[in-house]
């Protein structure tokens, strides 16, 4: 929602030192924002949602400038390593105005890494990008995780959160309404859907009140919803066989993060 976007942006701006908080406490990597603001900012690398890079510098020059702003000495800079990590080493001396949109997004990630922060904030890194670029950015994010970097990812794309995150928080109307591991979050919905491809319509007299809800019953498809903790699918298969039904195929559908999100925000 728009309200959640505003609060999310304010939260990131507070961490970045752009906005002063009015109340509360912020602890980042053991540092209190009020007492140690510099240490907090050095502990973070923030990748903004908007693509905003100087078109007249090369990636290599931009990273060196960024490192200088954080006080990284020349002998301690890892510019080439970072460019290699985000697959931009072959473009290190090209003007940024000549880079594609995907390359510019990767360059923003590279800028956030110059001072070796333990935490990276990626603000909707794949917003508005095509499928191929999204997959490439996902691989970059996974590479950072393997290096031990803690990543805070903001996204409206729920599949992205489910695919990449170990823990997920959901903001609704400015409030954090859920925060848990991805596995626990997905387990918040206990129902599961089962779809049978069959050869004829099922007689429902024998099929009702068996611990599941019938969603579809046609000449070719029978679909049910059931509680995965309480119901054994062998029971339904046995009932179908008793009616002389030929099961051509079975497809199982687990709830995804979108189902969890809708359930939480509606309640």
Residues covered by each model-derived region:
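Short, small-residue-biased leader/transition segments that mark boundaries at the very start
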Residues: 2-7
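Conserved ABC ATPase signature
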Residues: 95-99
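Conserved catalytic motifs of ABC-family nucleotide-binding domains
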Residues: 116
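ABC transporter nucleotide-binding domain
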Residues: 138-227
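Conserved ABC transporter NBD signature motif
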Residues: 24-32, 39-40
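Conserved ABC ATPase "signature" region
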Residues: 64, 68-91
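Catalytic Walker B motif of ABC-type/P-loop ATPase nucleotide-binding domains
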Residues: 120-123
């Amino acid at each position: 929602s728009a309200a959640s976007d505003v609060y999310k942006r304010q939260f990131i701006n507070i961490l970045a030192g752009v906005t002063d908080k009015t109340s509360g406490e912020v602890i980042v990597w053991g540092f209190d924002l009020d007492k140690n603001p510099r240490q907090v900012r050095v502990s973070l690398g923030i990748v903004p949602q908007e693509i905003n890079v100087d078109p007249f510098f090369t990636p290599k020059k931009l990273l060196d400038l960024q490192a200088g702003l954080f006080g990284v000495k020349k002998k301690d800079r890892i510019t080439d390593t970072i460019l290699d990590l985000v697959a931009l080493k072959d473009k290190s001396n090209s003007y940024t105005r000549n880079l594609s949109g995907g390359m510019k997004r990767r360059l923003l990630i590279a800028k956030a890494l110059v001072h070796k922060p333990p935490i990276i904030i990626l603000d909707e890194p794949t917003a508005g990008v095509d499928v191929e670029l999204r997959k490439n950015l996902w691989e970059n994010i996974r590479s950072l995780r393997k290096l031990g970097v803690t990543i805070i990812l903001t996204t409206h794309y729920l599949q992205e959160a489910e695919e990449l995150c170990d823990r997920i928080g959901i903001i609704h109307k400015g409030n954090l309404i859920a925060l848990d591991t991805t596995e626990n979050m997905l387990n918040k919905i206990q129902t599961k859907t089962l779809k049978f491809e069959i050869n004829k319509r099922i007689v429902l007299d024998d099929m009702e009140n068996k611990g599941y809800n019938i969603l579809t019953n046609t000449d070719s498809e029978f679909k049910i919803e059931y509680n995965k903790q309480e119901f054994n699918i062998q029971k339904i298969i046995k009932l179908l066989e008793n009616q002389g039904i030929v099961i051509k195929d079975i497809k199982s559908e687990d709830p995804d993060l979108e189902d969890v999100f809708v359930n939480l925000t509606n309640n």
